[in-house]
Regions:
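Fold-independent oxyanion-binding glycine-rich loops
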Residues: 8, 39-40, 62-65, 81-83
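Short, solvent-exposed amphipathic alpha-helical segments in soluble enzyme
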Residues: 19-24, 76-78, 96
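Ser/Thr/Gly-rich flexible loops in soluble cytosolic domains mediating phosphotransfer, phosphorylation
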Residues: 2-4, 78-105
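Glycine-rich phosphate/diphosphate-binding loop of Rossmann-like nucleotide-binding domains
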Residues: 1, 8-27
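Short amphipathic alpha-helical segments
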Residues: 18, 71-75, 92
Length: 105
């Protein structure tokens, strides 16, 4: 399964990057291709390419604030959670994404 997403917390420092790391590790551990863009205090990092978005089976938005470029995901299956959930339960979140897509986690 191909997963893309965005992580963005209120302050844009710690939780943004922790959520990114936890999601990427959980996705890779489950055998999925995953790319998470961060939108923090220093701007957008690891910006998703349109090709990655187009090829994605699902989008995970681990966000606590309004994000830039949400319209890029129009027409895609989206799971939106807080950064706290992405940090505390990344494996469950990846399993839920696989369930939504109809694949085995």
């Amino acid at each position: 399964m191909k997963i893309v997403g965005v992580a963005a917390c209120t302050v844009g420092i710690a939780h943004t990057y922790i959520a990114q790391e936890k999601l990427e590790n959980a996705g890779k551990k489950a055998g999925h291709e995953i790319h998470i863009e961060t939108q923090g205090t220093i701007g957008i990092e690891n910006e998703l390419k349109q090709k990655q978005i187009d090829e994605a089976d699902i989008v995970i938005l681990a966000v606590d604030v309004k994000i830039s470029g949400r319209e890029r995901f129009e027409g895609k299956r989206i799971i939106q959670v807080s950064t706290e959930i992405a940090i505390k339960s990344p494996n469950k979140l990846i399993a839920k994404a696989a369930e939504v897509v109809g694949q085995k986690a």
